[in-house]
Amino acid sequence: MRQQRLAYSLGLLVLICVYFFLRTDLANSSVQSRLQTCSEGWYITGYYVPREDELPDTAEQISVERMGDLSFSQKFLSEIRTEGWGITRFGWALGYYSGRWHRSDVGALDAAGNLLVDGAIAIDRALIPRGADVQISTLPTPWATKTFRATDIGNGIVGQHIDVFTGTGLAAEEETFRITSNNNRVCFMSN
């Protein structure tokens, strides 16, 4: 009887150990799937959304999809051609892509048509997966401590190049100049 109890207890102990071993192994697998990947030598640039009221200039007439002909500041239009989107004096966003001008009532959009938000970055999807959390610790404060989200792409974003969205207006433009740099350390975790 005593030997049966001992064998039963020993069997139960083995089962408990196997259970915890498997549980720990599975937990480690899920941690490993979210391990951070880091590398050096990244080129970082910034992009922003210009405001028409901050860029007065001679008026230029353009044709906006589904709206017709409208006039905007030439400096403003030039910035949009570079940056992708801008906020008009009317309060809606004006975008330039596929060789045409477009209106968005919700704001500036990323390449997938989603609202462009703080913390967004444009990446080369061959190197960083879409939706990955990205940290660039070599940027100046406060950017070095931010966690960015890889949600956007851009024509000029190829290889070890990340374009950080810095916000709206002239202050955001100044940040693009401040963060543009070479030889940055980039770490990311894919979701």
Model-predicted regions and their roles:
Residues M1-L13:
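N-terminal Sec-pathway targeting helices
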Residues M1-Q4, L22, S33:
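Short, intrinsically disordered low-complexity segments
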Residues V14-R23:
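Hydrophobic alpha-helical membrane-insertion segments, chiefly the h-region
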Residues D25-N191:
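Solvent-exposed, well-ordered loop and adjacent helix/strand elements within mature globular domains
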